[in-house]
Amino acid sequence: MGLRGLFAQGLLGKEGVPSQGLAKSLSARPGTTLIPSEAHSYRADTERTEGGHKVVRLAVVQELHNHGKTPWTPAGAVLVGPQGEEWKALGVWPLKPIAPGKFRQVVVEVETMEEEARGTFILKLWSQEGGGQAELFEGVTFP
């Protein structure tokens, strides 16, 4: 079970997994359809190492408002690091549409080396509806 599973079961919180509020640092790029109203980031250690480096799981949980005119359904995401490196999301949850004018919580989870989980990131989300334009959220940091 990853962080998404913990979140879905209500087990992801400050007691066991370090978390951090992103409300003051997170911003959507101009021209986006989705506006975050609340956001938190999480970090969880795994028992794994790769090449002698500790592997961690990171999650971003956002309450997103669709201020567009059509539904927006998450399809995938990447986390873009400070040097432009990208980590494909292990998953985006839930894969349900956000109706125009409505809010929905969206969770994105990635896995990376502990050393790479430092700095300020951009979260890039794209929709099932296509259109080619990704939703970009700047100022993502992790505890």
Stretch-by-stretch model annotation:
Residues M1-G31:
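A eukaryote-biased signal for short, well-structured alpha-helical docking elements
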Residues G31, R57-A59:
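Extracytoplasmic
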